[in-house]
Amino acid sequence: VYLYGEEHANEKMIEQELEHWEELYAAGARDLFLEDGYASAQLLNQWMQAEDDTLLNEHFKAVQGTMGGSEVYRTFYKQIKQNCPETVFHGTDIEHMYRSLGYQYLTYLTAEGKKDSPEYAQALESIQQAKRYYSYSYAGKEAEADVYRENCMAENFMRELDALDAEKNTDVMGIYGAVHTALDGMNYEDGTVPCMANQLYQKYGERIVSKDLRISLKDLPEETTPVMGEKTLTIAGKTYTAIYLGEEDIAAWAGEAAGRRFWRVEDCLLY
């Protein structure tokens, strides 16, 4: 599970995400997790099979006024459709666009006679999650809203991943705001619950790999260009396997240092 933490609508980061997805896709991956609601992602999956861009245009009409409405995302999706046509999107956020895309998807399923389907039930749950989140937010309970959403994102991700695991053994990739992807991070608003990636790491361990794209590659020495997964290191004349755990942006307090990268060295005892 490769997680990439972005600054939303940052063109350079989105270009990196596309490159990473194309690499994983070429290696056989097909499942891309997004910071979107379930219904929103399902409608994007329908667009992937469509001959025109009607559904994509409806998506961007719905999300106008948000960071997700940036044209850089439209380009991102169109390049995925062109270069990685078998991509399947998985939306694991609450359904922020429940008044538009959420009910649009429910209406579609109803017309198809699928009101009793698992897809309908999951879309409805995502909508209900959003309603509860905004009930907290509109009441001025921002901390409660943030905690609730973070837990929903983790639970929804686990549900989708576990369902995939039951069908096939495959790598997946996820694109989320960087506040959700630190393996040791806490929720943004009040830091009282583990963030999404932290919760995933607690359940799946080193299967979860995370990179914060806010740490610009140009600011890192060439030899530290990220390597996903694992590599070998020589320590005291012996070769060991090191597992990549993720990165942390430390620029705010470390002066010229942009970030630090964490590796776990297997079976290495130093005396």
Regions found by a protein language model. Name each.
Residues 1-271:
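Compositional signal for N-terminal targeting/processing segments
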